Amino acid sequence: MVGRDIDGAETYRISELAALAGVTKRTVDYYTNLGLLTPARSCSNYRYYDENALKRLIFIVDCKKQRLALSDIKDRLENQFPSSAKLDDEIGNLALEIDHMNQNISGILHRFERLKPEDRDKLKSKLPPEKLAVFQSFMLLLS
C-alpha cells in the first residue's frame, strides 16, 4: 500500500519499492546499506522511500543492466541526483566567485572613471560592440 508523507507526496515501503523497480527487498536493503538509497523512518521505525528513491533505484537497475560497478553507479547517481548539501556547497562557491567578480569589476570601473575623457573614449573604441555593451551595462549597474 502506497502511503503519503506529511507533504502529501507518495511514499513506499521496501516491498512496494522493490516491486515497482523489479528487484528484491534484499536488493533494496543492500543498496540502502551502501548509501545509494536513503529512506525516511516512521515513528514505528519502518523505512519509507519517496518518489526520488524510486527514480534512483530504477537508475541503479538500468546501470546494473549495463554491467556498471556499484562505485561507478554511485558516481553517476551523485551527478544525476545531486544532494542538497552538494548543491549548497556549489551555490556557496558560486556566490564567492560572484563577489570576487564584483570586486574586480568595481576596481576596473573605478580606474576607468579616473581616466581622462579622451582616454576613456579611446579605450571604448577598441572594444568590440558586444563587449562594449557589457561594459556599459556594468557601468550602469554599479553607478
Swiss-Prot record:
Keywords: Activator, DNA-binding, Transcription, Transcription regulation
Domain of life: Bacteria
Coiled coil: none
GO biological process: regulation of DNA-templated transcription
Cross-referenced InterPro entries: DNA-bd_dom_put_sf, MerR-type_HTH_dom, MerR_fam
DNA-binding region: 14-33
Domain HTH merR-type: residue ranges: 11-79
One MF annotation (Gene Ontology) recorded for this entry: DNA binding
Pfam families membership: MerR_1
Additional notes on this entry: Binds a DNA inverted repeat of copZA operon.
Biological role stated in the UniProt entry: Transcriptional activator of the copZA operon.
Name of this protein: HTH-type transcriptional regulator CueR
Source species: Bacillus subtilis (strain 168)
